Every structure is written in C-alpha cells, then in structure tokens.
C-alpha cells in the first residue's frame, strides 16, 4: 500500500530540470505556483484514495550501504552495481512507456474505424468537460479546456503546451491560469508506463502486481490533483 501511495503521488510530480522548458512555453508565475500546490494536493488525494495505517514495528528506518557483518560495500563495487541496476531500469521504463503510448495509439485507430473524428483524446475531452465547466469558465472556453485536458492525458504536457504557446498570451486570465496549472504535472498514460516500469525494476513481483492492478487509481489520483490545483488557483485569478 505504501508503494501504491508513492506511485499515485508520482503522477502529480514534475522534475525541477524541466521547469525551465515549461516556463518558456507557458506563464511562469502559474507554473511555479502549481508545483507546491500539486505537492499538497497529492498528499490530500492519496490520503483519501489510499489511506495507509502503519504499525510501530513496520515504521523503521532502513540503513543503506551496510552489510550483515557491519562492513560497508566497497565504493567501486557499489558504483558498478548502481550503474548496472540503473541501465536495466532505464530499459524497462523505456519499454513500458513505448508499450503504453502504442496501446493508446492502437485504441485511437480502432475507434477511428467506427467514426473518423472519434479518438481517445476526444472521449476523455467529453468526460472532462463537466469538470472544466465547474472551474468557472464559459461553455465555449470550458469545451476547449476539456479537449486540451484530454490531449494532455493521452499524450503529455509538452504537446498541449506546444499547441497553445503561441496564443496563450491572448487567453482570458482565468483560462490561462487553470490551463497552465492543470498541465503542470506528469499525469498521462506515458507516465503510467514509467511508474510500472520503475517498480518492475525496484520492487518485488507481488508489490508490482498490486500497483498494476490499481492503475486506475494512479490515473484518477493524477487527474484529481490537477483539477484541485487548477480550481484552487482559479479562485484567485479572474
């Protein structure tokens, strides 16, 4: 359950190394505001969706680098093991991301057989419309925001940012704020692949299977945190 909590919180994180790229494409003040708010809302959302109780016996601190006889592992041995482990982990993560993105593309192709405009993005956009409207937007703006939300969930935040970056300066301030805050997270199908891949390389099979069986909670947590953060910031920007 604790591993599932970590996985759920990972859906709402961003790495500091790419904040500069975000700020180049979107209003920087909302990007920087979204990061700490996402952290707080991730704690709230995971506590509601996956409450965990830990006994005093389980609440321990693990020592790293020590062996049973009290001697530490040689540095270069530790370095070699770390490089090997990281290499395997990267390959597992890349393979899982490719598989998840390919699965989303396959679903789009199958849906297009029934009706050309039908896609996973458009379906998620329709599902997200009531929530975007509840953020206090007019219907036409709420619809556009919902479509961007659907696109972000299927692809990633960079696709949406690249789409709107040329015009976002002309958006109403409220729409600009809620859109920027919503897309400032890793909540998408590709991240699901990263998380599953990471836990395959780090956790045992039982823990990994438990996380994989609750993958819906991961996506729900990411969406809920993004909506909570967008709603909170939107309250103060009109």
For each of these PLM feature ranges, what is it?
Residues 1-49, 206-228:
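Membrane-core helix-loop-helix motifs of multi-pass transport proteins
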Residues 2-5, 153-238:
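C-terminal transmembrane helix pair
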Residues 13-18, 39-43, 47, 93-97, ...:
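Transmembrane alpha-helical segments of multi-pass membrane transport proteins and ion-pumping complexes
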Residues 25, 50-55, 83, 113, ...:
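Transmembrane helix-loop junctions in multipass membrane proteins, especially transporters and channels
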Residues 36-87:
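Long, contiguous bundles of hydrophobic transmembrane helices that form the permeation core
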Residues 67-82, 119, 170, 174, ...:
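Juxtamembrane loop-helix boundary motifs flanking transmembrane segments in multi-pass membrane proteins
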Residues 77-88, 129-133, 209-216:
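Short amphipathic alpha-helical coupling elements at transmembrane boundaries
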Residues 84-170:
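Transmembrane helical segments that form the transport core of multi-pass membrane transport proteins
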């Amino acid at each position: 359950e604790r591993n599932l909590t970590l996985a759920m919180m990972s859906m709402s994180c961003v790495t500091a190394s790419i904040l500069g790229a975000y700020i180049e494409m979107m209003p920087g003040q909302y990007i920087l505001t979204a990061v700490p708010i996402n952290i707080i809302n991730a704690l709230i959302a995971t506590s509601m969706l996956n409450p965990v109780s830990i006994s005093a016996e389980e609440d321990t601190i693990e020592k790293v680098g020590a062996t049973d006889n009290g001697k530490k592992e040689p540095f270069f041995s530790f370095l070699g093991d770390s490089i090997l482990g990281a290499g395997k982990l990267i390959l597992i993560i890349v393979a899982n991301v490719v598989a998840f993105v390919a699965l989303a593309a396959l679903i789009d192709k199958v849906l297009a057989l029934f009706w050309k405009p039908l896609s996973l993005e458009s379906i998620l956009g329709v599902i997200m419309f009531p929530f975007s409207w509840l953020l206090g937007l007019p219907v036409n703006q709420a619809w556009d925001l919902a479509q961007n939300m659907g696109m972000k969930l299927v692809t990633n935040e960079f696709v949406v940012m690249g789409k709107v970056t040329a015009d976002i300066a002309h958006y109403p301030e409220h729409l600009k704020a809620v859109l920027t805050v919503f897309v400032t997270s890793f909540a998408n199908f590709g991240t699901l692949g990263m998380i599953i891949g990471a836990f395959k390389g780090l956790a045992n099979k039982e823990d990994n299977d438990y996380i994989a069986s609750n993958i819906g909670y991961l996506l729900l947590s990411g969406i809920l945190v993004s909506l909570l953060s967008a709603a909170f910031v939107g309250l103060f920007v009109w």
